């Protein structure tokens, strides 16, 4: 690969006259002025440009999306409006649905050009096709530009025989054969906008202003301050802080997990990438440029861009699969016979499982809208194949409600992967809801922060308070079973049962395929940076060592060896994924002393 500079591509400012285009730029995910080629296309040769965001108040009132994500979105829109004001323009927030709004705007504003960022997700493609048809019938030119992903996803699929790659290793092999991602374009400036200003009415805020949470029907009483401030301005500040860690960029050394790792970081970027407040291409090339500067012009490895590439991998897998977020009709998803257990699901979602590590994570998620990626792994494993044996589809819905950075592709893809429903995850890997947290934060400060009921427990018992003597519970002013729930399951028993369930499922899949999947089960021991299980422990919250220690998994480990089948997926894989697996016996209820 040839080296690429981080300098944004220069976009010439074309002369604009009175007979130029009347443009509307439709903001959706790309809520920024930097690296926004579709917005630049709206400006080019135009006499008037209006920047529009369409918000459906009915959707806001009826949507399952939680208040933290709505707050982040509204903050991002406010920030965008503030930036546009500096260019003598404004953001037009239009109420309604696109199919109803655009015919009126086309006529009322005399629109001749509509621009927007390409949306790779199935729902977005369907919506945009309808709008493009409508615009064509109205004589409106439509310009779309790709800037939400690094690569052309259709090109990746084409290189893979017209099918999406279903392992990360295969995905990496494909993109290594492609050209580098396009460089980011420069930000829209006052020079771009000086001759194409839209008329702003005095009552703009009343008609087109960004609404408040209260106006959208959200109760804000008791709502704490935002841990994550939405908007492009904040995103760029965070990017600078993120890249100040030169040693990390040079060596790609991940800091060891500790209690502080679990808290929201001022350098975190995932919600900003999800809403497009930060360009993934700008992030990519800023990383690239800094690595080459520190490493004296060495070409950076793909592993440096792991956060971005895993995102890209899931976008590629989802782009042509409208059933990507569910089991039924999803050709890549193994049809595992999960249990229906609404009571257990509710306790998990509300942070009332009786396992302080799991409950603290879910409480942080509900309060702040974010949790560390390894915390996501822990609660996803607990809900699905680890303990509760509840479908990953339920986890997708809860995360979609609560998680700031949740989107269709990455959220559903991560849940399928972590539940061993797709992407060749190793099912022997199981997170211990006691040992993992204890190894990460031995003092238990994270639990005390989010579960103040347990703050009086000594560190010895805070991860398994059910084992604390009655005198310790009384001293902590928290009686287990009264003030804090008993464990919902006996982890040691249920996790062993669930591993057997998965083992039988994969054996059936192997027989159907005519091959044995056991060749892909790791037989070596990899040094783990982060604890997964506690082999040999006799505690109620741990799993015994029944075999070789599992490999670390997922985006957390750039050195992970994906030793599962790596051939390009074909029709055989689709057939295998649709096999109906024999129903396994329901898990036994937890023992009274669990």
UniProtKB/Swiss-Prot annotation:
Its cofactor is FAD; (6R)-5,10-methylene-5,6,7,8-tetrahydrofolate. It comes from the Eukaryota. InterPro entries: Crypto/Photolyase_FAD-like_sf, Crypto/Photolyase_N_sf, Cryptochr/Photolyase_FAD-bd, Cryptochrome/DNA_photolyase_1, DNA_photolyase_N, Rossmann-like_a/b/a_fold. The keyword Ion transport does not apply. Residues 21-150 form the Photolyase/cryptochrome alpha/beta domain. GO terms for biological process: circadian regulation of gene expression; circadian rhythm; entrainment of circadian clock by photoperiod; glucose homeostasis; lipid storage; negative regulation of circadian rhythm; negative regulation of DNA-templated transcription; negative regulation of glucocorticoid secretion. Keywords: Biological rhythms, Chromophore, Cytoplasm, FAD, Flavoprotein, Isopeptide bond, Nucleotide-binding, Nucleus, Phosphoprotein, Photoreceptor protein, Receptor, Repressor, Sensory transduction, Transcription, Transcription regulation, Ubl conjugation. The modification Phosphoserine is found at residues 89, 265, 298, 553, 557. There is a cross-link at residues 29, 125, 241, 347, 474, 503 (Glycyl lysine isopeptide (Lys-Gly) (interchain with G-Cter in ubiquitin)). It is found in: Cytoplasm; Nucleus. The keyword rRNA-binding does not apply. Expressed in all tissues examined including heart, cerebellum, cerebral cortex, lung, liver, muscle, kidney and ovary. Highest levels in heart, liver and ovary. Highly expressed in the suprachiasmatic nucleus (SCN). SUPFAM superfamilies: Cryptochrome/photolyase FAD-binding domain (SSF48173), Cryptochrome/photolyase, N-terminal domain (SSF52425). Residues 532-594 are annotated as: Disordered. PANTHER family: CRYPTOCHROME, CRYPTOCHROME-2. Belongs to the DNA photolyase class-1 family. Transcriptional repressor which forms a core component of the circadian clock. The circadian clock, an internal time-keeping system, regulates various physiological processes through the generation of approximately 24 hour circadian rhythms in gene expression, which are translated into rhythms in metabolism and behavior. It is derived from the Latin roots 'circa' (about) and 'diem' (day) and acts as an important regulator of a wide array of physiological functions including metabolism, sleep, body temperature, blood pressure, endocrine, immune, cardiovascular, and renal function. This is Cryptochrome-2.
């Amino acid at each position: 690969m040839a080296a690429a500079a981080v300098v944004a591509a220069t976009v010439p400012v074309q002369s604009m006259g009175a007979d130029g285009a009347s443009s509307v730029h439709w903001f959706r995910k790309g809520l920024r002025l930097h690296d926004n080629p579709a917005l630049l296309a709206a400006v080019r040769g135009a006499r008037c440009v209006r920047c529009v965001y369409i918000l459906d108040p009915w959707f806001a009132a009826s949507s399952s999306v939680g208040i933290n994500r709505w707050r982040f979105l509204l903050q991002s829109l406010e920030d965008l409006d503030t930036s546009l004001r500096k260019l003598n323009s404004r953001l037009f927030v239009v109420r309604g649905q696109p199919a109803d709004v655009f015919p009126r705007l086309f006529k009322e504003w005399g629109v001749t050009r509509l621009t927007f960022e390409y949306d790779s997700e199935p729902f977005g493609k369907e919506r945009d096709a309808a709008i493009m048809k409508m615009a064509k019938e109205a004589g409106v030119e439509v310009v779309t530009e790709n800037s939400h992903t690094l690569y052309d996803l259709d090109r990746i699929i084409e290189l893979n025989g017209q099918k999406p790659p279903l392992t990360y290793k295969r995905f990496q092999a494909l993109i290594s054969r492609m050209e580098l991602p396009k460089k980011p374009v420069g930000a829209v400036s006052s020079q771009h906008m000086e001759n194409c200003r839209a008329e702003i009415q005095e009552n703009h805020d009343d008609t087109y202003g960004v609404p408040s949470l209260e106006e959208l029907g959200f109760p804000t009483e008791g709502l704490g301050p935002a841990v994550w401030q939405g908007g492009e301005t904040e995103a760029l500040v965070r990017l600078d802080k993120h890249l100040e860690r030169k040693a990390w960029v040079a060596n790609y050394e991940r800091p060891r997990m500790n209690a502080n790792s679990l808290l929201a970081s001022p350098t975190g970027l995932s919600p900003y990438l999800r809403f497009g407040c930060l360009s993934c291409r700008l992030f990519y090339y800023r990383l690239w440029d800094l690595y080459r500067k520190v490493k004296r012009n060495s070409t950076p490895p793909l592993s440096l861009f792991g956060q971005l590439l895993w995102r890209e991998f899931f976008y590629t897998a989802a782009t042509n699969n409208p059933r990507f977020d569910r089991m039924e009709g999803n050709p890549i998803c193994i049809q595992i016979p999960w249990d229906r257990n609404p009571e257990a699901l509710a306790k998990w979602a509300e942070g009332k499982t009786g396992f302080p590590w799991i409950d603290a994570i879910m409480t942080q998620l509900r309060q702040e809208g974010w949790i560390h990626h390894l915390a996501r792994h822990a609660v996803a494993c607990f809900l699905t194949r680890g303990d509760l044996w509840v479908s990953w589809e339920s986890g997708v819905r809860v995360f979609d409600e609560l998680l700031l950075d949740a989107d269709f592709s990455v959220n559903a893809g991560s849940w399928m992967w972590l539940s061993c429903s797709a992407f060749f995850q190793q099912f022997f890997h199981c997170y211990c809801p006691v040992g993992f947290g204890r190894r990460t934060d031995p003092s238990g400060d994270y639990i005390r922060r989010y579960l103040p009921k347990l703050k009086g427990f000594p560190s010895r018992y805070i991860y398994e308070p059910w084992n604390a003597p009655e005198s310790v519970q009384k001293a902590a002013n928290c009686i287990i079973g009264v003030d804090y729930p008993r464990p919902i399951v006996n982890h040691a028993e249920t996790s062993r049962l669930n591993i057997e369930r998965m083992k039988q499922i994969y054996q059936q899949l192997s027989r159907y395929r005519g091959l044995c999947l056991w060749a892909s089960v790791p037989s070596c021991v990899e040094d783990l940076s982060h604890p997964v299980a506690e082999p040999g422990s006799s505690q109620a919250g741990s799993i015994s060592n029944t075999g070789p220690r599992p490999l670390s998994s997922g985006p957390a480990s750039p050195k992970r060896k994906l030793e599962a089948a790596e051939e390009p997926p074909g029709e055989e894989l689709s057939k295998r994924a649709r096999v109906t697996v024999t129903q396994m016996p329901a898990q036994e209820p937890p023992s009274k002393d669990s």
